[in-house]
Each structure stands twice: as structure tokens, then as C-alpha cells.
Design a protein with these regions (language model features):
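Class I Rossmann-like S-adenosyl-L-methionine
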Residues: 1-304
Length: 304
């Protein structure tokens, strides 16, 4: 999905290079993911550094000597900061953006501590893992993800990253929401492929969806007569096209499995009402394909 999204955003998509594009775009998207997660780690480290330096001042105030530690002790931020697997991945990819460009760490931290949102959290006596996790998620969605200066920096650093940013930010929010007190370090790190078979499937799905894009575009157009095509979310179209590809060109995948999979993806990555729209279009097309005998599924019970 991510590779097709990036391919769709490209001004000059070259379908002769889709496989190479898949590998490159997947790697670049993962590097962006690591970079953004590392930003949370560095903001947390910056807060700890400020507290430590304040406590060491010759004329430290009472609040500096005994600071409110709620932010630096936030268990989700602590888990991210102590995540050795994350650090290995960053080192492997040679990513150290925020040590070189610390101004964005300072910028986001200063915006946070100046907010009522931060003040309310620090003053709250509520202390449980869910509350702390929700705070980190809200901080990310309200301060980090929409920050224009950060967006400009990422665009300048690597132009293709801004095309991937919506999907990456959404994935980070979903991953943060899965963190629990005893979660393994891998929870925050999405696995690109389960195994070699999964990698091959991703490659085949990309190639077949991209090469038949015009056919699937026409199918969507013909089955959404009351919709302004420009107002249909790009991700919704991509998800529908991928589902159509599975319907028509992957004979071993049951129709219900495909529908359920893409409804879940639409709930996770697209707009709030996307799953209703995607379900409606897919339902109409499945009925049409059954009537036209185009669902050539191999194996007993696979169509249903």
C-alpha cells in the first residue's frame, strides 16, 4: 500500500522500475518511520538534560531542585528511550538526524511545555499506563505530526519523505497505541515482511496492481457514479485497486479474506468514513464479478 501510494504521488511513475521502486520506497519509508520515532526519544532526552542541568545550578530554585518528573518518567517515553532494538535499527540505517539538527527537538519541546495540554498533564494526579500512553499519542498527533517546520525539514532532507509522511505518522500512532507495560521492544517497530513468501506476495501485488491501474480506475469510476472523483481519498482508491487485484489476479485468496483485510486497512490508515465507502464499492464489484463469472478462485469455498 505504501509503495503504491508513493508511486501514485510521483510525477513521473515508471512502471518498468516498479520492483526496484518497491524495495527503495519501502526502505525509505522505514527510515522515515525510525527518524520520527527517534524524534520522540530525543525530545525525552532533551527534557532530562534540562532537568539535570537545572538541578546542578549554584543558585537552583526549590522547583529546580525538586522538579516535577512526570514527563521524564512517562513510562512510554522511557520504554522508547531504553529500546535497544530501536537504537540498533537507527545505527544500522546510519540515522542521527536529531543529533545533527537539534533545533527541531528544542522547538517541539518548547511548544509542548508552553501549552495548557502539558500543564494539565503535569498537574494531574492520575497516574496509570493508559493515561501516560494517551498523553504521548496526543502529543504526537497535536504537536509533532502537524508541525510545519518539521515538515519543511523532512522535505528538504529527502523529498520523497513528505509523500510517505501521512502513512508513517498514522502507523506510529497505531504502534504507540499497542505499547503495554510488558510489551517487547519490537512492538514499536513494524515488521516489513513476515517471510520471503510475504515479500514475494508484496512484490506481485504491487506489480499487478500498478500494471492494471487504468482498468481498476475505470472500475471505480463506473461504480461510484454519484461521487466527485477528486474528492475520493487517494488511499481509498489505492486500497480498492489492491482489493480488485486480489479478486481478479490472486486465485488462492478468498473474497471474504480480501474484503476484511482492506476494510481493516481503511479503518487504520484512511479517513473515518473510509471503511463504509470502501465496503460499498467492493460489495458492488464482487456482485458484478460473480454475475460476469470473473471470480476464478481456486479451491472449494474460496469465492464466498
Amino acid at each position: 500500500m505504501q509503495a503504491l501510494y508513493a508511486l501514485h504521488q510521483s510525477e513521473q511513475p515508471d512502471l518498468l522500475k516498479e520492483e526496484k521502486f518497491l524495495n527503495a520506497s519501502t526502505a525509505q519509508m522505514y527510515e522515515l518511520y525510525l527518524t520520527i520515532v527517534d524524534l520522540l526519544v530525543e525530545i525525552h532526552a532533551h527534557a532530562k538534560d534540562i532537568l539535570e542541568r537545572s538541578q546542578q545550578k549554584m543558585l537552583a530554585t526549590e522547583s529546580e531542585k525538586n522538579p516535577n518528573l512526570k514527563f521524564v518518567n512517562n513510562p512510554v517515553l522511557v520504554k522508547l528511550s531504553e529500546n535497544e532494538l530501536l537504537q540498533k535499527e537507527l545505527k544500522k540505517a546510519k540515522l542521527n538526524n536529531w543529533r545533527l539538527d537539534n533545533e527541531y527537538v528544542v522547538l517541539l519541546y518548547n511548544e509542548l511545555i508552553a501549552s495548557d495540554f502539558y500543564a494539565e498533564y503535569m498537574a494531574s494526579e492520575t497516574s496509570d499506563f493508559k493515561t501516560d500512553r494517551d498523553f504521548v499519542i496526543d502529543f504526537f498527533t497535536e504537536f509533532v505530526a502537524p508541525n510545519d517546520k518539521l515538515y519543511d525539514y523532512l522535505e528538504d532532507y529527502r523529498l520523497t519523505w513528505v509523500d510517505d509522511l501521512p502513512v508513517v505518522n498514522t502507523t506510529i500512532v497505531k504502534r504507540l497505541g499497542k505499547i503495554k507495560p510488558n510489551s517487547p521492544e519490537s512492538t514499536i517497530l513494524p515488521k516489513l515482511y513476515k517471510d520471503e513468501e510475504d515479500r514475494q506476495f508484496a512484490k506481485d501485488l504491487l506489480l499487478r496492481t500498478a500494471r492494471n491501474d487504468e482498468e481498476y480506475e475505470a472500475e471505480i469510476l463506473g461504480n461510484t457514479p454519484n461521487w466527485d472523483q477528486d474528492r475520493i481519498a487517494t488511499l481509498d482508491k489505492i486500497l480498492i485497486k489492491m482489493a480488485l487485484c486480489e479478486f481478479l489476479r490472486f486465485s488462492s485468496i478468498p473474497v471474504k479474506v480480501t474484503i476484511n483485510e482492506y476494510l481493516e486497512l481503511s479503518k487504520e490508515y484512511s479517513t473515518p468514513k473510509s471503511s463504509i465507502f470502501v465496503n460499498g464499492v467492493l460489495d458492488r464489484l464482487v456482485k458484478k464479478y460473480k454475475k460476469d463469472n470473473r471470480l476464478n478462485k481456486a479451491g472449494r469455498g474460496l469465492i464466498e
